[in-house]
Amino acid sequence: MLDIQLFRKDIDAVAQRLATRGYQLDVAAFQALEAERKQLQTQTEELQARRNSLSKQIGMLKGKGEDASAVMAEVGGIGDTLKASAARLDEIQAHLAELMLAIPNLPHESVPVGNDETQNVEVRRVGEPRQFDFAVRDHVDVGDKLGLDFDTAVKVTGSRFSMLRGGLARMNRALVQLMLDTHTQEHGYTEMYVPYMVNAASMRGTGQLPKFEEDLFKVPRKVGSEDGERIENFYLIPTAEVPLTNIVRDAIVAGEKLPLRFVAHTPCFRSEAGSYGKDTRGMIRQHQFDKVELVQVVPAAQSFEALEQLTGHAEAILKKLELPFRTIVLCTGDMGFGSTKTYDLEVWIPAQNTYREISSCSNMGDFQARRMQARMRAGQGKPELVHTLNGSGLAVGRTLVAILENYQNADGSVTVPAALQPYMGGITRLEPEM
C-alpha cells in the first residue's frame, strides 16, 4: 500500500507514475473524498472545541448556582452532530483505505517505461543454447518414459496436475535439496518450514487480497463463538512469500537484526484464473507446483542493493545446473502489483526455441510493510517501515522441465547435471522405463 501522504502532496505526479504501468487513478473521486474528509475533520475539531468551551461554562454556571439548562441543551445538540460527523468520517476513511488497497506500487525511476512484456529489457545472458544433432522433443515426450505421469494425475485430481515416479521424482527432490543447501550454506538464508494455508490478514499483508482473490484456492471453515457459527476462510498459499513475509507483520524488528533472509520449500497453489488455453501441455502452468522461495527484510536504504544480491542468488542455481538463461528487467507495464522493480530470470527451453520465466525477483519497497505494519527501530530512534523483497530460487517444476529438455539424449535418456549427481547417489543418467 502506498503512503496516502503522496496523494495529498501531489496527486497528479502520482497519477502520472501509475499511468506508466497502465493504472488509471480516479483523481476526481479521490479529491472529492479528501475534500469531504478535510471538511468533516475541521467541523469535528470546531465542534469539539465548542463543546469543551460550553462544558466549562456549565461548570461555572453551576458553581454560581445559576441555570445551565440552555447551555446543556446546546452541548447535547453538539454531541448528536459530532456522532453523525464521526460516523460519516469513519465511512470516508474506510472508503479511502479500500481505494488505497487496490492501487499498485509506484515503479522505481530505474525501471524502463513500457506497456507489456515486449518492452522488457535484457540485462545479461549466461550460457549458450545447446546445438542438438537430433530432433528435439519437449519435456512431455521426454518425461513420458521417465516417470512423468499426467494421465493418473488427471484421474486422481484433474487437469493441470502431474505425478512424478522413480528417478524423476528423485531428481525433483534433489533439485530442492540443491537449492536449499546453496541458499542456506552459501547465501546466508535461514531455512523455514511454514504453513501451507494462511489467513486473510496474511494475504492482505503481501497484496494478494483483495485484488487477486479469484486466483486463490479458498478453504472455508466453521468457527464457533458466543454469537453462533461463522465462516472463516483459510487460503492455500500461492507462494511461500506470503507466510515468510508475514513473519514480520505487526512487529518492530531491532535494526541490528536486519537484514533478515528466509528461504522455504513449499508447494504453491494457484487457480490460474484467466489462463484458459495458455500452456495447457505439460508442467509449465499448473494448479500445484513446488518452489523454493527467497524473502529478505531490509532497511529502506539497502533494498535496491539487496535486489541485485537476491537476483544473483537465484541465478547461482541456474549456473550450477549449467542451464542457459537470461535476466531481464520488467518494464512498468509488466510488473507485478506490489513491485517497485522486478528482474525475471528466463531459462532456455529448446522445444519452444525460446526463454521462459523460471524466477521473478522483486523489490517491494515499503509497499507490503505498510500493509503489514512491519517496522524496524535503529537504536533508540522512532520505528520506521522496513523494505521487503522476494524471489523464486527457483521454481522446481520449471527447472525440471529445463533439465529434461536441455539434457535430453537421442536414446531417450536424460543426463543428470553434475551439480545434482551427489544428491542422487552418483546417478549420471535417467534411463527410459521399459
Curated annotation (Swiss-Prot):
EC number: 6.1.1.11
Amino-acid positions noted as binding ATP in the UniProt annotation, renumbered to this chain: 270-272, 357-360
Pathway noted in the entry: Aminoacyl-tRNA biosynthesis; selenocysteinyl-tRNA(Sec) biosynthesis; L-seryl-tRNA(Sec) from L-serine and tRNA(Sec): step 1/1
GO terms (BP aspect): selenocysteine biosynthetic process; seryl-tRNA aminoacylation
Entry similarity comment: Belongs to the class-II aminoacyl-tRNA synthetase family. Type-1 seryl-tRNA synthetase subfamily.
Cellular component GO terms held in the UniProt record: cytoplasm
Subcellular location, record wording: Cytoplasm
Lineage: Bacteria, Pseudomonadati, Pseudomonadota, Betaproteobacteria, Burkholderiales
HAMAP family referenced in this protein's UniProt entry, alphabetically: Ser_tRNA_synth_type1
Taxonomy, superkingdom: Bacteria
InterPro entries given in the database record: aa-tRNA-synt_IIb, aa-tRNA-synth_II, aa-tRNA-synth_II/BPL/LPL, Ser-tRNA-ligase_type_1, Ser-tRNA-synth_1_N, SerRS_1_N_sf, SerRS_core, tRNA-bd_arm
Molecular functions per Gene Ontology: ATP binding; serine-tRNA ligase activity
Quaternary structure, from the entry: Homodimer. The tRNA molecule binds across the dimer.
Catalytic activity, as annotated: tRNA(Ser) + L-serine + ATP = L-seryl-tRNA(Ser) + AMP + diphosphate + H(+); tRNA(Sec) + L-serine + ATP = L-seryl-tRNA(Sec) + AMP + diphosphate + H(+)
Free-text domain note: Consists of two distinct domains, a catalytic core and a N-terminal extension that is involved in tRNA binding.
Function: Catalyzes the attachment of serine to tRNA(Ser). Is also able to aminoacylate tRNA(Sec) with serine, to form the misacylated tRNA L-seryl-tRNA(Sec), which will be further converted into selenocysteinyl-tRNA(Sec).
The name this protein goes by in its record: Serine--tRNA ligase
SUPFAM superfamilies: Class II aaRS and biotin synthetases, tRNA-binding arm
Protein keywords: Aminoacyl-tRNA synthetase, ATP-binding, Cytoplasm, Ligase, Nucleotide-binding, Protein biosynthesis
Gene field: serS
Major localization class: cytoplasm
N-terminal signal peptide: none
